[in-house]
Structures are given as structure tokens and as C-alpha cells.
Swiss-Prot record:
Name of the gene encoding the protein in the UniProt record: rpa2
One annotated Gene Ontology cellular component of this protein: mitochondrion
Keyword line: DNA-directed RNA polymerase, Metal-binding, Nucleotidyltransferase, Nucleus, Transcription, Transferase, Zinc, Zinc-finger
Species: Schizosaccharomyces pombe (strain 972 / ATCC 24843) (Fission yeast)
UniProt family annotation: Belongs to the RNA polymerase beta chain family.
EC top class, as a word: transferase
Entry keyword annotation includes Repressor: no
E.C. no: 2.7.7.6
Protein name: Probable DNA-directed RNA polymerase I subunit RPA2
Amino acid sequence: MSFQTLERERTFKNPPKDGTSFPDLQKAVKPHVDSFNALTNAGLLNYAVKEIGEKCAFDSITQEEGGALKFGNKISFRVDEVQIAKPMLSSRERSSINRKVYPAEARERLTTYKSRLVLKFSWSVNGGPRQSEMREVGMIPIMVRSNRCHLEGLSPAELIAHKEESEEMGGYFIVNGIEKLIRMLILPKRNHPTAIIRPSFANRGTSYSQYGLSIRCVRPDQSSLTNTLHYLNNGVTMFRFHWRKNEYLIPSMMILKALLETSDKEIFEGIVGKDLGNTFLTDRVELMLRAYKSYGLYSQTETLQYLGSKFRVVLGVAEDLTDVEVGRFLLQKVVLVHLREAKDKFRLLLFMIRKLYALVAGECCADNPDSPQHQEILLGGFLYGQILKEKIEDWLNSIRAQINLDVRRSAPGVDFSDRKYLTRVFSKINNDIGTKLQYFLSTGNLVSNTGLDLQQATGYTVVAEKLNFYRFLSHFRMVHRGAFFAELKTTTVRKLLPEAWGFMCPVHTPDGSPCGLLNHLARKCEIVTHPSDVSQIPSLLLSLGVDPPSVVGHESGWGCVQLDGKIVGWCTYKLAKHVADVLRLMKIEYAVKLRNGTATEPAKVPLDLEIGYVPPSHNGQYPGLYLFSNPARMVRPVKHISTGELDMLGPFEQVYMDIACFPKEIVPKVSTHVEYSPTNVLSIVANMTPFSDFNQSPRNMYQCQMGKQTMGTPGTALRYRTDNKLYRLQTGQTPVVRPKLHNTYGLDHYPNGTNAVVAVISYTGYDMEDAMILNKSAHERGFGYGTVYKGESFDLSQKRRRGEPVVHHFGFAPGSTPRREWLQKLDADGLPFIGIKLEDGDPIVAYYDESTGQNFIETYHGTEPGFVDEVRLLGNDVGDSECQQIHVKLRITRSPIIGDKFSSRHGQKGICSQKWPTVDMPFTESGMQPDIIINPHAFPSRMTIGMFIESLAGKAGACHGLAQDSTPFIYSEQQTAADYFGEQLVKAGYNYHGNEPMYSGITGQEMKADIYIGVVYYQRLRHMVSDKFQVRTTGPIHNLTRQPVKGRKRAGGIRFGEMERDAVIGHGTSFLMQDRLMNCSDYAQSWVCRDCGSIISIMSTISMNGVGSASEVRCRSCAKPALGLEDTSDIWQDGSGKKFVGGTNTTLIALPSVFNYLTAELTAMNIKMMLEVK
């Protein structure tokens, strides 16, 4: 390995003009970009509008004498085509020659990168000739580097010319200047019936059991609908579906009878086949057939008519459709929607019933919905297309609703043949679909009438933070299980399953609440985004001996062959195994021809076809041969042993295959595949941990998180970014010790830390509990020196209502005399000088009101000084009005101070506890002084041996000028890392084990023990004292509890919790607790009755003789009404004039104010609190 320093320098000076230098980096984001491209390239939007179909309305509906409805003129309308343009300047802007709008402009102007959405709207009246027109329905956000972005296909040199990173990957949207990403979610595998045992199913009604079968059916436009079969204890199965967030149940027999003109015998044979000896199965089918007789529906027409009459109102169909047509519409829209033909739906439903009965009988086990075998990925582009489809349908529904409203109100001019009438309808409805999509991206909230067959309504988008490049890249490889699962108390969904090998990284997941729910794709895991051509598969299967599908019963002991949820045949399990092997060889052979350029015809078997052969077993998974070619599947490359060629595997088929991790693990005639590299199981970020195979696993997990929290290099085009907060490491270095993949992904473009000389020694008392001592001279030379950039925007247009004239302008009012202190910071145009230092309260921008001639300033609010780095003037979309908005970027210097957090790449985090003078630092024989000193106690319990190895390797690499390879799994017990790097150290004249004699910097004497010293790559994390320190003497308090409010920004108090309480007691300073928890918090004085112990019944009173008694505060509860016989001096009265005696035994005590509040709350609940006063 080499550092590639000169090559990198040449690349920066002369960026490539032909293509990317790091194809693997672009490939990491490919699923996001390709899924958005599929909206137009794969015709998903055209499929969507075809699926929406026609809407219709009538200009009159009257009821005739027989009860029949008479319809007037009928208008039928639909959307024929969807067009998404590329972002261009507004047509109102007429001066520009180049009219393209690039993402950099949207970032800098804090606007949305969007383009026009145009629909081809067509209509006909009474079935006459069809008319059409193009309607613009708003501006929709566009994904960066997609086929609707001007950056598509640009080389690094061209990207730099357009103010982008040289390796800009895209895959995100820009909304109001913020980069937003639709994150990937896990969904159930499409078009595959999944057996489920769920106790909650039994709560749905009488006779319902815990057994069910679910299938998530996906249409060609990628919208989905989940169908569920329920098993009832009386043998009947019920078919469940959702329509517009409402749930409906229909007997499965009714669906079967409605799909085809069939007989009970055909249904019996279709479920049972030739397996007549299975009495459990035959009894249940017979019970189901008998139970259906109660409906009295025998023919297909009768059944369709019955369904149509029940669901007419629910479906909201046209009034002129018959009940039979409504029934057919129901079957088309909600029953196994991935299949078009009724006979295919019929066959699959029979198979599902058969599998459900097998689950109940214990012939097969329930499928695990938490296993990647039964999961797929919801891609951002597909979700975006589904939302767009629903908004288009809502738009059509709003047109129909407006026409119906006009007809009901007998509005003048309702004439379907008049084009002007439709124009008036369009003017009355909301034609802006783009704003709804922009709202979705900016908030992540899904506003939907149907719910889109998803389990959550929020949390779909995240900000693609550029804290550092690791964090930015991780966003695109992140896969979330779903918000619903985060609330579950069970940990089952979080478990790492063996089926995830090679698809989900076992290391890269957060610790804490999202652990196991927020995962990341393995490095080589890809996601299919386009459906493959499998039109030749059915005929190929028939030629291999598979029996064609038929309604009549299949042989006993035969397995079902399915292709994307469609039954394509039946065969024996032995033949199914043979067919699976043949298909695999055929797809590999075609891939070889394709690579060699010898392919002359389309592939019969596409390379990414998933061939899932499930063998028969005892109480195992339901057997069969399942083929999948649809999008959103995870696939990964492995090496096929017999041919030596690449094969793409999916998680469904991998479970039943024998894949060796290393070539030496291959078992002859058993292993079929071998991994290309054992590191392919890890994510990109997890692969960057050096020698991760030497570390305890939690430490590798911690490093994956801390690597993304590092103050690093977010990018090279920082001049053109307007982030709210941006961190930058000024003295970033390339690591001496790094894996080969560090160069593969070009991470030297974005350095994330600094190489430091680290000594492991307990030298002072300042290195306890993971603290580290920093060499003061290393700090002065720039170790860990960083900068924080903060952006502030000032918009004068928000100071006026829409439509009002512009009266506010930047600068000072003509003829006015600004203050001298303002002019020290601000120029004559009211904007700050570049490079000026701003303290808290200093003016940052000035503006004036031309109507009053008054000057105003906006001040800088910050706890630390900032320097004005850039000032941007932001115009509007057309550029035809005065500048009303500016953006100021502030540079805040952050050199490391005591309390700032650092970490190595092995999860060894700690804070800087002291900057030690270099004259007092220990030194080696050669005069080398460590940059960092850490305590030896950091290692025994953490077992981060990888950090020892890195120290050895870094020291040897620095001596020889080598970039050391730290890829995991390359060393073994026969060839150890310690030997390899130890010999390099010996050649450089150092100790084999990395130890050196060191001399005390205070006494100059040699230390008795040799000290372990070497070079380790250290990261400075973003957790800094400057952002977190909190001091309070007095400040705002809560109006109810009278305690200090919380929050650093609000000058709030510091939390004193149970651990702090225990520490104070443990140190024998318990009186400090009273000071902290009461005297300095909510100290209050309150009167209490000594007799009854109440603080609620105390009241101020008036003495009858007018002379103040010993206690003017008395207890109303202990007092008795005065009878007039008592001494006048003992009688007192309350505010209403009632006279009492007694209740004088009260005293003043100190209490927390919140205790009074608690007492009042308990009293409201009829709970009396009594205090014992001594």
C-alpha cells in the first residue's frame, strides 16, 4: 500500500474529465438514485396513472318511477401521462441565456431544488372523442444527480465547475437549502405468502385463532396492498384487507367463488390435491365448503353481485356501474393485486389456504418476519413515486368533487362540452401537488388517505448531515426497521440473525434505544432497482420437466414453483432441486457471455434472479421453489466454485446454500460458493476500523458511532455551503495505518483525524478514568485544531405581510447618523465587514424602514466570539426585486481545551484533562516525546488489542515511510500481526514489542519499566466543552414549581439527580444537598398547624379586638365556630365575617416551593397530607 500523496495532489489540480476515480463510492448511493430514475426510466409513473384509472361525474341524476336511476351527461377524465422537467429558471426571468438551475444555487439561496410537474389531462363526454391538455400542477423537488438533475453524468472536473464536490454522489433532495434524504425502511418481502403465529389475531372475534398468512402484494407502480388470511377454529378461513385505513373481512370461499366460475369439487382438489390421506386437511376444507352454504351464493355472478352491493359505497365507484362490475372492481383493486389474471389469483389463493392449514396442523413452522429472508427494502424513489401517485389521484378526486358540488348547487354554466367550464373547475381546486411533496421531504410526515400500506406516518426523511464524510456516507447505507418497532418492549426484533450475513453489517448499529433497529448495509450488498425480464422463465421451466399450473389437483408430495408470487408449475422436490441448479448455471453462463461481449440474445435467466429452493423438512419452512426477480431486493456477489464466476445471491436463497468464508473452508461436493473477501460482511464504516478482528466487539460498535461524531473534513466545496453548523478539522492527516478500502473509497480526500505519538503510562494523576494528557507543544503545533462554521440568515420579507410594498432595506436610512459602535462592525450597506470579530451583543446586520426613516440592527448572540467568513446576498427566483435576504457565515475557532473529547479508532474515548508543558513530558532515548499520554488501565477490561497492533504498525510505518495495511482477517495464528510489525521495528532499530525506555520529564531519571509507545490515529470528537458548559447563579424559574428551568440556551439550572445525591452523601457532605436542592432551588417559607399537621388549612385572620395576637395565621381546620361566650381576645374572624376560636397553634417552617404545589395537587385528589412538626 502507498499513501498516494502525489497522485492525490495531481487529482486535485487536474480532476478527471472522463469519469469518477472511485466507482465503489458512487455505487454505495446507487440504490437511491436509481430508484428515483425508475419513476421515468422504468415507467413507474405511467404505471401509476394507469392504475388510478378514470374518474367520472354526471350533470344530473334523477330517480324514475320504478326506482331506477336516470343519468344525464357523463364526463370521464383521467391522467394519461406524467412529465417531470429538469430544473430551469422561471419563465418570468427573460435576461439569462443559460437557463439551467444547479443544486449549488438551491443550497446557497436556501431554496428547494425543484422542477415543473406537468400532467396530460384528458376527458371525454358520453364516450365521445377524447380531448386533452397539459396541466402544470406545481414544482416538485428533484433528487440530486438523478436523471432529472443537470449534474447527471458529469465528470469530476465538470462537477467542480458547478460548485460541487469532485466525487458528488447525489441521492438526496435539497429543501429550503437543507439536504434531505428519504431513509430506507425494512418491509415484508413482496408477493410471498408468509406464515404467521400472532396471539393478537385471536382477539379479532369469536372463533379466531392465532394462525394467519400474510402476503404483501406489490403492483407494477411499486404501490402495495397487504392481504391476510385468518384461520378460524371452525375450519373456515377469512380474507382481510385494508381500504383507505379501514379494515374489512370476507370469507375466503366468497373470494374464490367470485374469481372464477368454479365448483366445490375444483376448490377441494385445488387445496387438497392427491393428498386425500391427510384427514386434518380434508376435514377443514369440507368444513369451509359447508359453512359457505349459508350465504346461498352458488354462481360467480351471484357472488360478484353480492360483493358489489356491500362495497359500492366503500369503494366510491361511479353511480352507473352495476353491482357485478363493482364486485369485479373490488377483486381487481384489493385481491392479490400483483396478479392480473383471475385464474392466477385463484391458484395462489388456493395455495395460501393449503399453507395456512399446514401451519395449523404443524406440518410447517411460522416464517420469521424479523429475518432478512422475508424482508426487502423500501427505497426512497419508490416511496416518492407512491406519494406522487396518491396526490395525483387526490387531484382527480377534487375535480370530481367540485363538479358534483356545482351540479348539486345548480351552479350556472355547468356544461361538460364547454372547455371554459373545466377551466373554471381548475381555478377552484388546489393545483399545487409540488408543495405537498415538499412538505413530506421537509418534515418526514406522510399525509395520506390510504396510509400507503405502511406502518408509520412520520420519520421518513432525515437531514443528510455533513458532520464528516463518514456520517454523510452512512446515511445512504442506513436501513431502519420502522418507528413501530422502536416502541416495542420485546427485544426479538433487534436480534442479529445468521440470515443477515453479508446483507446487514453485524457491527455498525448504534448502542442505546435504536440498537438493532437502525442497521447498515454491508459493503457489497446491492439493492435491485429495476425489474428483470423473466418472460422466458415459464417456458424454460416447462422444458425442464415442471408440470404446468392447473386448477385440478396436483400430485401428493409435489412442490409448488412460483415466480414473483405467481404459480408457474408443480414438480417433485428432487426435480425442483435440479431445476434450481440448472437455472443458477444458466444465469452465470449468460453473465460470462455478457462480460466477454459474446451474448447475442437476451438473457433467459437474469443474473439477479433469486432462486430460493426450500427443501422438504419436518416442521420446517414450507417447501417449494420460489423465484424472485422484482425490485427492492437485497443481493450480494459471491464466487461460484464450480465455474469460478460471480453469482448474485439474495437473502431468501442464501439460507439453504453452503457458502465458505475462506477458500480453505470449502467442503468438496458440499460447498457451492465462496466469499470473495471475509470483510464483505462489514459496512463501509466498520471496514475502516483497523485490526477490528483483534478487538472486543462492543468497541468496534462504539468506533462506528464515534467515527461519525468526529470533527473531520465534511467536504472540499465548503465555500458554497450554507449549513446551519459545520465542523472542520484544520490539521487533518491521512492515517499511517489503514485498510485497503480506505483508498478504494477515496477517504484521503476527507481526513478524519491526526496521527499522534501515544505513550501508555500512568504519568500524572490527570489520566485517570479514560482521561488523556495532551502535549502542550503538540497543541501549539496544531494538533486537533478545528473550526466551527455557523450560518445565520436574515430575511426582511418576513417583517411584512404578503402583498404589502417593500419598506425595509439593508443599510442605514438616508440622512440618519448611525452610532459609532455600529460603524465599527458594519459597512455603509448595513452588512458586516468580512473578517470582523463579533462578540455577544455586537451588531451583525443593519436595516431601516423607509416609511419612518428609523434604523434597526440585528445582534449576534453567542457565548464565544465569531469571525464573519462570508456574506451572501440572496435574491428571489426571478431576480426582479430588491435583495431582502442575506446569509452570514461565521467562523468560530475551536482549539482543543481541557474537557474536549478525543478517541482512537478502537472505541477508546476520553477527554483531554490537561495540557502538559513539553519540558515536563517524558521522553525516549532518541528525544521523542509523546503527543498523548493515556492510562494503562484503559486496556485490560476493554480488550482493544487492535489499538496495540495499530501502535506497533504505526510506529513501523512512520519509521519506514509505509502505509500499513490494517484490513481485518489477514493475519492468523501462524502469521501473526505482532511478528510482522515487530520485525519491521527491529529493522528500524526499535524493540520488537514496541516498548522503549523512557525518562521522566521532571527528574530526568530513566523509568524502571519500559513504556509502550507508538503512533495511533486519533480523532477529535464534536463533543466540546464550549458547546456544553453550563453556569447559573440566578435566572428564570418555572412559574408553577418555582424551580430553575432546564436548558442551556435558557440560562437554566444543572440537573442534580440521584447519582449526584449519592455522591454527596458518600462524601459525608449531606448538608450540601439542602443547599443544592432547596436553598439554591425553590426555597420557600410556609405556615403549618402543629396540631393537625396541615399546610393547606392555614389562613390569615382578623382579631376581634383589633389588637394583633401572638399568631395572626391560624388553622381553619382546627378552629371551632365562636358561640359568643368566649373571651373577645380569643375570637377571630375570616375574610367573610364568620367568627371562630382556636387553631392558633401554628408555626413557620422552610419547605421547597414544589412541596406546596404537590400538597395542593394531592388535596384536589382527596388525599390529605399531614406533617409531624417537632
